């Protein structure tokens, strides 16, 4: 199957992935055998090109579920099974709500409410992250428009994947959604990771520059996790820096991470960037961030991500009695 062959004068080669299920050892029903073989094939694909795998219940349980997710992505999109929850972002100085981050969930008919750690990786590997990302953007913009009509003026941050940024017309698609929903561009912020712009930096930066120039906020997410460094920030058209929760987790007045976070905030300010801290869970962490000059905090200390219908009540009650 891997042999090279000619097609219309062009030499082609394939790298097959094969999944094998055996009857009656694995199952006797045809549909079950096919499903198990599909799951084994998915495991073979993840192992690399030109591989084969036998069905193994103990090793392939997770892979089979991921394969099932991949097969149902299109149906889920058509049936509007993806929903957004919104985690508040709080101004550190005033303790007022200054916006929300939109986080996608899958209201799965079989598995219930599925969190993104179970399907985003599959979506990225399969390429489905591109239509899913646009669906998330549309949902967030529609919700912003609905809130504004109800008298709630706020902003929403939406995560964007590398594959989306690599689409030459990505910025045009985003601006089209903004125009269709009638929201103010300044109310929308896109969160990216540094690795998202490394492979095709020219295309990604062109998209980001067009969106920033249109009035959108651009936030660099997960800063302090992995590759990200200040040397690369000068070339990125960003307006905000988001410190990763791994640096916030151990934050206290006595901990060395306090100096790291404070230095990060200081350097970001010199680049005229606003700073967001994610994963804030304690009052001590909030105090350290306030002393360090952080602009915005987000985390369970304030609230878990909320369904859209609960945001109004949270917004009103937090404005009246903020968490300190």
Q: Which residues does each PLM region occupy?
A:
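Structural preference for long, well-ordered alpha-helical segments in enzyme cores
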Residues: 1, 33-40, 102, 122-123, ...
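Short catalytic/binding micro-motifs of nucleotide second-messenger systems
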Residues: 1-11, 43, 140-148, 178, ...
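Cyclic-dinucleotide signaling modules
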Residues: 1-67, 71
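Surface-exposed amphipathic alpha-helices with a cationic face
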Residues: 2, 144-148, 178-179, 205-213, ...
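Active-site core of bacterial EAL-family cyclic-dinucleotide phosphodiesterase domains
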Residues: 22, 54, 65-122, 159, ...
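EAL-family c-di-GMP phosphodiesterase catalytic domain
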Residues: 24, 92-96, 107-110, 161-168, ...
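Catalytic core of bacterial c-di-GMP phosphodiesterases, primarily the EAL and HD-GYP domains
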Residues: 52, 62, 91-101, 126-204, ...
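Signal-transducing alpha-helical linker
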Residues: 61-72, 78, 124, 128-133, ...
């Amino acid at each position: 199957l891997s042999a090279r062959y000619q097609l219309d004068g062009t030499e082609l080669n394939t790298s097959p992935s094969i999944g094998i299920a055996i009857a009656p050892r694995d199952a006797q029903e045809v549909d079950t055998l096919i499903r198990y073989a599909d799951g084994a094939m998915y495991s073979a694909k993840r192992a690399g090109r030109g591989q084969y795998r036998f069905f193994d219940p103990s090793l392939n349980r997770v892979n089979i579920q991921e394969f099932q997710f991949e097969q149902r992505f299109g149906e889920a999109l058509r049936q509007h099974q993806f929903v957004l929850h919104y985690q508040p972002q709080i101004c550190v100085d005033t303790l007022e709500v200054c916006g929300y981050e939109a986080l996608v969930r899958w209201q799965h008919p079989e598995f219930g409410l599925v969190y993104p750690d179970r399907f985003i990786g599959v979506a990225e590997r399969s390429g489905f992250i591109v239509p899913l990302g646009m669906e998330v953007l549309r949902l967030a913009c529609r919700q912003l428009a609905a809130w504004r009509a109800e008298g709630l003026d706020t902003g929403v941050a939406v995560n964007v994947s590398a594959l989306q940024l690599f689409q030459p017309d990505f910025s045009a698609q985003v601006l089209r959604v903004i125009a269709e929903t009638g929201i103010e561009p300044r109310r929308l912020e896109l969160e990216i990771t540094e690795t998202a712009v490394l492979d095709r930096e020219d295309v990604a930066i062109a998209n980001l520059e067009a969106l920033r120039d249109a009035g959108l906020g651009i936030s660099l997410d997960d800063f302090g996790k992995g590759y990200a460094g200040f040397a690369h920030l000068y070339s990125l058209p960003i307006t905000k820096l988001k410190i990763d929760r791994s640096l916030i987790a151990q934050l206290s007045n006595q901990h060395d991470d306090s100096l790291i976070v404070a230095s990060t905030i200081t350097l970001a300010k010199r680049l005229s960037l606003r700073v967001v801290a994610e994963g804030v869970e304690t009052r001590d962490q909030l105090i350290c961030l306030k002393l360090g000059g952080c602009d915005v905090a987000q985390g369970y200390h304030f609230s878990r991500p909320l369904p859209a219908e609960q945001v109004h009540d949270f917004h009103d009650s937090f404005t009246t009695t903020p968490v300190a």
